[in-house]
Amino acid sequence: MSDSEERSVRGLVEELVRAFPFPDPREADPRGLLAYGGDLAAERLLSAYAQGVFPWYDEDPILWFSPDPRMVLRPPSLRIGRSLAKRVRAAPYRITMDTAFRQVITACREATRPDQEGTWITSDMLEAYCGLHDLG
């Protein structure tokens, strides 16, 4: 991504954060619940993630969380260790990206988990995330 493209994206994110603000994450309850309601429009989701907030619910209303502590991966600064890189190269599988997004998220949604009923990947969430993926 060029510098001008990066500035453009940064400007768009700042605009979305102003248009769809969330409360200060320090106001979250002990579980990280920060807000409820709203919708899963792409603009709101992008604004939420830019503010360290994500939706996690299984029926209405939409619940928005910002737990502390929270792990954040920043791909440009992510360093893969030598032993992991060696294992990936030697593994009998193939790593691909952006080839079957809907199928992968649907499989995650349908996976059974011990001691857990249902899934947080509701039909609305599936469509919202597929919509974000389609936007790039």
Question: For the regions a protein language model found, what residue spans apply to each?
Answer:
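N-acyltransferase acceptor-side catalytic subdomain
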Residues: 1-136
